[in-house]
């Protein structure tokens, strides 16, 4: 009991000397800061794309060649388009910027992409474009098809694999037959050259009776 009385005696002067805290945070509301109004958005209703077309093929070795045509009221300069390709694993954006054809027309533009190697299992090529910098972005897609001639002497096995991926089995079997015949004729020609240069001369020297008139 004496200990409690001593603590209360020491606490009384300390509590009496503590300052009173104000619980009011803001006596008056803060003043409003006047800001300048935002500039109006530019009117882009006049810019539009009325027609878009995409054509893309795969040359020998999986080299992509694509052409995109745009017609409409386009701004000058037009925003740089982007090209992506889609495979079975996903999308890729490593495609370089397409080249724009220089023409005098302001209502039509053409973009080219040549000799860019893509995977054999490419499903789609997507071309993203916009008629102006503030306009909505559009895209047009195309499915690349392997371009194989009727006599596919220079086609590779990758091209045949691409034909099978596109479910063009008849063309793939035809190309495989031509390539098999080509390799067979090449092997026959190599054997004939080897026979004439080496084997026949060796037989003449060691077995001359094989080439006598009696035979």
Curated annotation (Swiss-Prot):
GO biological process: symbiont-mediated perturbation of host defense response
Secretion signal, residue range per the UniProt entry: 1-17
Domain of life: Viruses
UniProt keyword Transmembrane helix, yes or no: yes
Disulfide pairings: 56-142
Cytoplasmic side: 204-215
Record's bilayer topology term: Single-pass type I membrane protein
Quaternary context: Interacts with host TRAM1.
Protein name: Unique short US11 glycoprotein
Gene name as annotated: US11
């Amino acid at each position: 009991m004496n200990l409690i009385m001593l603590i209360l005696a020491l606490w009384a002067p300390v509590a009496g000397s503590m300052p009173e805290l104000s619980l009011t945070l803001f006596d008056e509301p803060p003043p409003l800061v006047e800001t300048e109004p935002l500039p109006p958005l530019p009117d882009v209703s006049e810019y539009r794309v009325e027609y878009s077309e995409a054509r893309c093929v795969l040359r020998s070795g999986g080299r992509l060649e694509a052409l995109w045509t745009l017609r409409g009221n386009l701004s000058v300069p037009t925003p740089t388009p982007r090209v992506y390709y889609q495979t079975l694993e996903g999308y890729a954006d490593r495609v370089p910027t397409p080249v724009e054809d220089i023409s005098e027309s302001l209502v039509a533009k053409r973009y080219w992409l040549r000799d860019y190697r893509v995977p054999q299992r490419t499903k789609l090529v997507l071309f993203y474009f916009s008629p102006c910098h503030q306009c909505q972005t559009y895209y047009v897609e195309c499915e690349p098809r392997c371009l194989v001639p009727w006599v596919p002497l220079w086609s590779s096995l990758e091209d045949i694999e691409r034909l099978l991926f596109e479910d063009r089995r008849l063309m793939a079997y035809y190309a495989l037959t031509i390539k098999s015949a080509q390799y067979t004729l090449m092997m026959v020609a190599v054997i004939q050259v080897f026979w004439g240069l080496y084997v026949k001369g060796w037989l003449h020297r060691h077995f001359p009776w094989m080439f006598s008139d009696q035979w």
